[in-house]
Amino acid sequence: MRRTNLIASALLACFFSTIPAFSQTVENPAPVGADVTKKMPFAMVGQAIFRSGQSWYEGSGTVVQSKSVLTAAHNVWDPVNGWSTNVQFNRARSGAAIATRTFASRLYVFGSYRTVAARYGPESSRAFASDLGGLRFNVAPAGGAYAGWRADTRTLTAGAPVLCLGYGAEFHSGRELLAVRSASGFIPVVGAFLESTALTFEGGMSGGPVLSEVAPDDFRVVGIVVAGSATPPAGGIRALDAAGAAFLATYLRY
């Protein structure tokens, strides 16, 4: 998914129009509302704002350990500009209200991402299959609380319903948490990159969590949003597999 420039997203939001639900054949992201944003595990999701080169961009992420946030690798590293700078995480943002604002002290990307993205391009399926990134903080963004996660790709391919979250800034303002539900599962494309043509994601949602209810009221992060297309409609995710679990256990364990 292309990075969403903050200036461009503000202009695009002006042209957004809501299509009646009865005419939709594809699920599109919609705001969850301020009250839901404050509840677990939604309150662990945040807006990431960062600088790459001479421009500012927006993405999403989830607190998965006391001082660690899981996001997309393309939010923190780019083949042209290298590492992102001034990475700010606005947890549980709803309009002007932000639960906590923290700045990352360290950035991480999945082992093969830089090589693959440089060779095939960050918009390639191969790059999306390695598109895991992490943020480390000196202070806990949620006071020590965090969302649980699980590495189980069967949750995503068996057709079980999952909820995909992020701060979409393509057709929305980027200041509200959006959600879109997948009821039909995802199809494997390359490695841990899965796709669905039954839903779409907006720019700015990249790095946001894919949540599965593994038990009543027990939601776990099982993947992250990495790619989206309105024409043709499609949404791509990077599933948490064994390699993804090793990445979290190694770099996002604090």
Predicted regions and their residues:
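Acidic glycine-/aspartate-rich tracts in secreted/extracellular proteins
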Residues: N75-W77, R93-A96, V139-A142, G168-E170, ...
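Conserved catalytic-core segment of clan PA serine endopeptidases
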Residues: T25-A43, F50-W56, W77, N81-A142
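Catalytic histidine site
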Residues: A43-R91, S184-V190, S229, G235-D241
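Short, solvent-exposed loop/turn segments that connect beta-strands within catalytic domains
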Residues: G53-S55, S94-A99, S173-G174, V214-R220, ...
